[in-house]
């Protein structure tokens, strides 16, 4: 198993010295990074990348044998269809296995059901490009209950088997759920931690 670095939390170090950063994480044993991509707004000052940043980073990543298997994506919750072509191209060009989304801002049953339908559609489109879709939890979707489950569990189940889980154990713990218990209970859905 390889461990990767979520680039959001180390964006300052990356910006200051990309090559020095990659050398340091390579020496520490990391072989993957997971950037956060935005599409509609340039939020690079807040730790996000745009697709062009990924392209520019690839030669340096290759030099240090660092791969990108998963990418967090921040899309318009209701109109992400515009990004299908971009996501497909990224999956094929860079061999990205997983695109990672989060729960919607509003965690009501109706909104979660609507989101699940959109995520199923997105997962089907990504599957055509050889990639999959994962949902990353945050504290709020663990704290809020829907039909007796965490909002995160409810959304995962509503999405069906084509959508997997990327578990943030820290947020899960902060939300009051034992991460180990969750991982064992949902081992078939968890693709990344």
Regions found by a protein language model. Give the residues of each.
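N-terminal pre-domain/capping segments
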Residues: 1-93, 97
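Active-site beta-loop-alpha junctions enriched in small/polar residues
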Residues: 6-10, 36-40, 73-76, 103-106, ...
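Charged helix-capping and loop-helix junction motifs
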Residues: 19, 47-56, 81-86, 112-120, ...
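Surface-exposed amphipathic alpha-helices with a cationic face
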Residues: 26, 58, 62, 120-127, ...
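A local structural micro-motif
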Residues: 33-34, 69, 99, 134, ...
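Helix C-cap/helix->beta junction micro-motif
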Residues: 63-64, 94, 122, 128-129, ...
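Hydrophobic alpha-helical segments and helix pairs
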Residues: 89-109, 119, 126-127
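Acidic/histidine-rich catalytic cores of soluble enzymes
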Residues: 126-193
């Amino acid at each position: 198993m390889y461990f990767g670095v979520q680039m959001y939390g180390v964006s300052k170090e990356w910006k200051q010295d990309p090559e020095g950063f990659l050398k340091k994480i390579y020496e520490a044993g990391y072989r993957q990074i997971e950037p956060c991509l935005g599409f509609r707004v340039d939020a690079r000052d807040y730790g996000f990348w745009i697709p062009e940043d990924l392209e520019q980073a690839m030669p340096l990543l290759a030099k240090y044998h660092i791969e990108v298997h998963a990418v967090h994506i921040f899309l318009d919750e209701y109109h992400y269809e515009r990004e299908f072509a971009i996501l497909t191209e990224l999956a094929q060009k860079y061999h990205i296995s997983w695109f990672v989304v989060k729960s919607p801002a509003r965690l009501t049953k109706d909104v979660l059901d609507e989101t699940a339908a959109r995520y199923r559609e997105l997962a089907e489109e990504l599957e055509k490009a050889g990639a999959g879709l994962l949902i990353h939890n945050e504290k709020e979707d663990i704290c809020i209950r829907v039909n007796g489950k965490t909002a995160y569990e409810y959304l995962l189940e509503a999405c069906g088997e084509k959508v997997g889980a990327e578990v943030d154990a820290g947020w899960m713990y902060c939300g009051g759920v034992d991460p180990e218990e969750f991982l064992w209970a949902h081992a078939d859905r968890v693709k990344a931690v």
